[in-house]
Structure formats: structure tokens, C-alpha cells
Amino acid sequence: MPESQIIELGTLGQIPLYSLERALQDPLRAVKLRRQIVSQHQATGNIDFTTDGSALPYEGYDYKAVLGACCENVIGYMPIPVGVAGPIKINGKMVFLPMSTTEGALVASTNRGCMAINAGGGVTALVLGDGMTRAPIVRFPSLEEAGAAKQWLGSDAGFLIIEDAFNASSRFARLQNIKATAVGSDLYIRFTASTGDAMGMNMISKGVEQALEAMQKHGFESMDVVSLSGNFCADKKPAAVNWIEGRGKTVTAQATIPEHAVRETLKTSVEALVELNVSKNLVGSAVAGALGGFNAHAANVVTAIYLATGQDPAQNVQSSNTLTVMKNVNGDLQISVFMPSIEVGTVGGGTVLGPQKAMLHMMGVQGADPEQPGRNAQELALLVAAGVLAGELSLCSALSAGSLVKSHLTHNRKKG
């Protein structure tokens, strides 16, 4: 079929936009034709828009990697600037942190934080917990049956049955614990499992499906699955359960900044930083009724690194849960962050794309760790926490010194 006919039929809605890759067996050609269909469609006809004449690029991209994995109805790709902060010394290693952002001053500020941290010997960071969660809703005919199911899940015998079914779903998924809450005759079951180097949402969802089938075969035939996700997980929304129980990687990172580095690099004082952190990040956040937001701007750094490394940017909602603490220790500044729900992976999702894969490689965490599955994803979580630590340190310093507006005018406003 001639391209002109494909475009005409697509414009009239007789060929679905989503079917072009399958029909043409050529992802790049499908993108090219879809751009023309969108340009000629009545939805864009009255706004003088053409994708061919637009600044949105489409050539020179690996759409085969995108197909069936990352995006649908593709008309191009969105270039976002990528900068590097650092290198920063973390657990004895020097690493650059890639950050993809359009916010001027963010990379420069984080880089300044890295410099100050290195002056004190670097960051020490630990993974305190590692478990992705999924929480389906199941429904029973009566409250009594829901209660019996909750009790069974909490028993050794019940857990072993569920564990066997769950673990059989994957080489890497390993069930850690189950927490069930009954609301009337509905049961919300929060499964927690390790998922290797994958972020793990798809993996754990598959395991949960098999676990629920096992439940139905072991005395709970009347159980109906209302939804595989019941928001007790909780994914992509603020939730106390993630702050308290953790989700993904639970990480803490700490550094000591010598007084001279605080004064010379950060242009402030230890006393001013400690006071500002209490007033802003602790008291101010409490006044605001913050949930997991006891920090200055953790989400800025988390999202920038996520975009650069192929993570799910929407998961910055829970991944940015951060408690920032600053103390005066013998005249120097001790700063730490506690992040209970960093959700990252080094395989799957956007990590299959070439540019994102390259940034993971630069950080030394690309792909699956063949010797210790999960180690690369844990290392990435530590690097995210180190970046957040640097970002918190620099922004709070700018606020305490009164230089925030000046720095943004310098880095975020084009002259002339």
C-alpha cells in the first residue's frame, strides 16, 4: 500500500495509529508515517502544527527497543539535557552522577554539594532493606472467611504454601513477608519480595497471581480477586505505609563536612545549617503536614537521576520520601538522609534504551550482577541517596546564606 494511502486512511481513522508497527514491520517507517497522520489530522488542523516541521526529532533512534516495552503511538523522542554532578566519593569509590533536567542550577548545586562532601572523605551509605511490594484486594462471602484467610496467611503452614507458589514464578523473585489487613469481608494482602536487579513491579505481580491461585486451591475457593493492586502497595502516590514499612530499597547515607569546607565551599556556617534544617525541613514540614517530605528538595535529584538512567519517573513520588538530618559534631557538620522507599532497577523498563543504558554503565551498575543478583540495583539506590545528600547540603547552604535567588538568576535565566 502506498504511503499516501496509509496516511489518508490513518487520518480518517480507518487505520488505527497503534497498528502501524505491526502492519509495516518497520518501526522507523511507522513513526515517520504516524507523524504525518498526526500533522494532517483534524485534531491538529486548526493550530498550524506539523510534526515534520517541528523541533521534535525522530531519526537516529532505536525504536525496536521501544516497541512493546517503553512507549506506544510513538512520534519521536524528547531530548532532555543531561549533566553530571561529581564525581562524588561513596563507600570509597568515585562516581559521576548523571542528571537529566531542564532546571538550571540543579546540577551546579548538586555538584557543589559533591565537592563539599568529598572534602570530608565522602559518603558512607547503607542498604537497610530491599523488597518490592504488591497488595491485591481479595473478597470473601463473609467477614468470618476473610478473618480465617488472614489468620491462615499468618500461619507457618499458610506462608510456606504461598511462598512456594510465589517463588516458582521467577528465578529471582523471593517472597519475604506478607501483611494482611481486613476491611469488612475484603482482605488487602501486602506481599513483599526481593526482585534481583529489576525494579520488580511486573515480577512481583506475576508472583502474586500465582500465590492467589494457590490460596484458592487450599481452602479458599470462594475468594474473588477484586484487583491485583489495591493501593496498599502503595505505588506512585503518597502513603504512610511506604514511609513506615519501606518499599524498594531502604537506604541511609551520611557524610561529615569539615567546618572549613562549609565556610569556603558552601559559604555558610555549621550553626546556620543546623538551625535552618530544624526550622525548615523538620518544623516547617510538620507545619505543612508533610508525609515523607522532611527534606529540602530530594525529588529534584531523584527525578533527574531517574530520567537519566531509565527509571520510572512517576515513582519519584515515593522514592523521594526523605528525612534530612544535620548535626554539629565537634564543630563540623554531620549530614544524613534516610530514604525508606527508593524504587530502582538496572534491568528492564527504560534501562533497555541505549542512552539510559550508557549512563548506568558510566555509574558502574548497568545490567544484572551475575555473581550477586540485586547488587547493581542496590548500588544504584545508594548513588541516588548520595546525590540527594549532596543536593540537600547545597540547597540548604544557599538558603542559609541567602544566595538561592542569585544562583537561579545566574544559571536559570538566559541573558539578552
From Swiss-Prot:
Active-site residues, record numbering mapped to chain: E103, K236, D312, H408
Family, per entry: Belongs to the HMG-CoA reductase family.
Glycosylation site residues: N167, N277
Membrane topology reported for the UniProt record: Single-pass membrane protein
CDD domains listed in its UniProt record: HMG-CoA_reductase_classI
TM spans (from-to): 380-400
Protein name per its UniProtKB record: 3-hydroxy-3-methylglutaryl coenzyme A reductase AN1593
Induction annotation: Expression is positively regulated by the cluster-specific transcription factor pbcR.
Functional pathway: Metabolic intermediate biosynthesis; (R)-mevalonate biosynthesis; (R)-mevalonate from acetyl-CoA: step 3/3
Subcellular location: Membrane
Species of origin: Emericella nidulans (strain FGSC A4 / ATCC 38163 / CBS 112.46 / NRRL 194 / M139)
Catalytic activity: (R)-mevalonate + 2 NADP(+) + CoA = (3S)-3-hydroxy-3-methylglutaryl-CoA + 2 NADPH + 2 H(+)
InterPro entries xref list: HMG_CoA_Rdtase, HMG_CoA_Rdtase_cat_sf, HMG_CoA_Rdtase_CS, HMG_CoA_Rdtase_eu_arc, HMG_CoA_Rdtase_N, HMG_CoA_Rdtase_NAD(P)-bd_sf, HMG_CoA_Rdtase_sub-bd_dom_sf
Function: 3-hydroxy-3-methylglutaryl coenzyme A reductase; part of the gene cluster that mediates the biosynthesis of the diterpene ent-pimara-8(14),15-diene (PD). Within the cluster, the HMG-CoA reductase AN1593 functions in the mevalonate pathway, which produces isoprenoid precursors. The geranylgeranyl pyrophosphate (GGPP) synthase AN1592 is needed in the formation of GGPP, the precursor for diterpenes. Lastly, the pimaradiene synthase pbcA performs the 2 cyclization steps that convert GGPP to ent-pimara-8(14),15-diene.
Record GO biological process: coenzyme A metabolic process; ergosterol biosynthetic process; isoprenoid biosynthetic process; secondary metabolic process
Gene Ontology molecular function terms on file: hydroxymethylglutaryl-CoA reductase (NADPH) activity
Domain of life: Eukaryota
